[in-house]
Amino acid sequence: MFDKLLAIIAPHYCYRCGKIGSILCSNCKKYITSRQYTSCVLCGRIVKKANLCGTHRQSYDALWCFGLRQGVIKKIIDDYKFHRVRAAAAVLADLLDSRLPTLSDDVVIVPIPTTSKNMRRRGYDHMLLIAKQLAKRRNLPYRPLLRRRNNVTQHFTKSSKERKRQARYFFEPASMIDPDKTYLIIDDIFTTGATISAAADCLKKAGAKRVEVAVIARHGKP
């Protein structure tokens, strides 16, 4: 209700063309979603379907990425995360939705949980809001099945190797895992892949047989 009222009082402008009404107008959204990201997020090889080629062994079974973290996509993500533009949740869910294939009925959407510090700063869990929107579009359940360990701090300035080593201790299961379900982890940015690998590994160790991943944007080039 508040978001609708705010949209009337202070309407958004399209981040790409400037048209009044929404963060990304229908024409610009159609244009952006038509430009599919077709590279493996780990090595940059051209792929046909998902964004992970067959040469990499990971704790997750498939990965989809909407695009690179640049231009309009970068601005939408950054404003959503750092400037409390909550309306961006629906737009980012649309971008993820456009990249994903048909999903089976046994899929459960699992957001990467934000840190307590960022929750206090933003006032919301940014990936949980996107998970709710995506679940609504796909008519699938979402569950916050991952919990961050309170004694582990994420350091973004560390080297890739150090981040991957540290990431093993990021998460623990928040509740019971059904081995008959497929779990789709969603996150906003893929950099080294350490966070999603740790999340997938956590779910697998808790009993999940199949874990897939969907991310909005790849930061930098492989």
Predicted regions located by residue number:
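Glycine-rich phosphate/pyrophosphate-handling loop used in enzymes and phosphotransfer proteins
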Residues: 1-187, 191-222
